[in-house]
């Protein structure tokens, strides 16, 4: 991959920084693994906005990605690496020995033509998926399941990874990139190595229109609104919020903890907040 600073031919391109990967497939994606998806612009079935700052954007198909990696003992060859508009990581099209093709999250360092394996007998090599029971302590992993057989839910974004810290009984301890230490069942699967496209965070959008292409609408500050629209609104001329930061609905924000899922609290050994 290469970091490309665009020639400043306009104000929008002056600050633009691109991440270019010449190894990505330049043709169309694999059609049998595409699915249609419609945009809701952040509205629910009643037409009410449930997620702000969504709307517009370019149309694209959903790539059906295999997060379970459950074809055990069958070798898979990486046919090509592709861009996926639905996520920050790139994806890899793999061809199994029995003729089936699947998309997977492309791990760091995996190249076209490389052989990948899944299952408890797979070697400890980047891109291979094993139950955590069979992964050595201290190994860097990604695409981690939270429930056995459900599919990977943690460490799936570009450049992310986790570390297997310990195993005790039926649970293992995993340290996530945020600093949180979490318990997962040893039968949950994880992939060796880090997620690829690690330079994704170095890109600079450059102009507001590039976010509109991605379906991201503007974020208006509360102090720029009227009192009817936001607790920070109102005042004569430019004024401060006049209170601690809150959301449009009055909930404290900017660091205020809102997690309420007590059901899985016992699985968190150490929270990402150090205080």
Curated annotation (Swiss-Prot):
It comes from the Bacteria. Keywords: Ribonucleoprotein, Ribosomal protein, RNA-binding, rRNA-binding. Residues 50-59 have a biased composition (Basic residues). One of its GO terms (cellular component) is large ribosomal subunit. Residues 35-49 have a biased composition (Polar residues). GO terms for biological process: cytoplasmic translation. This is Large ribosomal subunit protein uL2. The gene is rplB. Part of the 50S ribosomal subunit. Forms a bridge to the 30S subunit in the 70S ribosome. The keyword Repressor does not apply. PROSITE patterns: RIBOSOMAL_L2. Belongs to the universal ribosomal protein uL2 family. InterPro entries: NA-bd_OB-fold, Rib_uL2_dom2, Ribosomal_uL2, Ribosomal_uL2_bac/org-type, Ribosomal_uL2_C, Ribosomal_uL2_CS, Ribosomal_uL2_dom3, Ribosomal_uL2_RNA-bd_dom. One of the primary rRNA binding proteins. Required for association of the 30S and 50S subunits to form the 70S ribosome, for tRNA binding and peptide bond formation. It has been suggested to have peptidyltransferase activity; this is somewhat controversial. Makes several contacts with the 16S rRNA in the 70S ribosome. GO terms for molecular function: rRNA binding; structural constituent of ribosome; transferase activity. Residues 28-59, 224-275 are annotated as: Disordered.
């Amino acid at each position: 991959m290469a970091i490309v600073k665009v020639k400043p031919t306009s104000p929008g391109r002056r600050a633009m920084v691109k991440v270019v990967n010449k190894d990505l497939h330049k043709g169309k994606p694999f059609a049998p693994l595409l699915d249609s998806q419609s945009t809701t612009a952040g509205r629910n079935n009643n037409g009410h906005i449930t997620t702000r700052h969504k709307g517009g954007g370019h149309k694209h198909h959903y790539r059906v990605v295999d997060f379970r990696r459950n074809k055990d003992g069958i070798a898979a060859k990486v046919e090509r690496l592709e861009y996926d508009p639905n996520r920050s990581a790139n994806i890899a099209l793999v061809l199994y020995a029995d003729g089936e093709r699947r998309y997977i999250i492309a791990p760091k360092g995996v190249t076209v033509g490389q052989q990948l394996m899944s299952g408890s007998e797979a070697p400890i090599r980047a891109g291979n998926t094993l139950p955590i029971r069979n992964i050595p302590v201290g190994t860097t992993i990604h695409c981690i399941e939270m429930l056995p057989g459900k599919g990977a839910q943690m460490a799936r974004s570009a450049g992310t990874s986790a570390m297997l810290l310990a195993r005790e009984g039926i649970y293992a301890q995993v340290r996530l990139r945020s600093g949180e230490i979490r318990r997962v069942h040893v039968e949950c699967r994880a992939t060796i190595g880090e997620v690829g496209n690690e330079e994704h965070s170095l890109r600079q959008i450059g102009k507001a229109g590039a976010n509109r292409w991605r379906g991201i609408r503007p974020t208006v500050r509360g102090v720029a609104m009227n009192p009817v629209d936001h607790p920070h609104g109102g005042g004569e001329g430019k004024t401060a919020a006049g209170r601690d930061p809150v959301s449009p609905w009055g909930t404290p924000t900017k660091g205020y903890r809102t997690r309420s899922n007590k059901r899985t609290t016992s699985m968190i050994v150490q929270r990402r907040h150090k205080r």
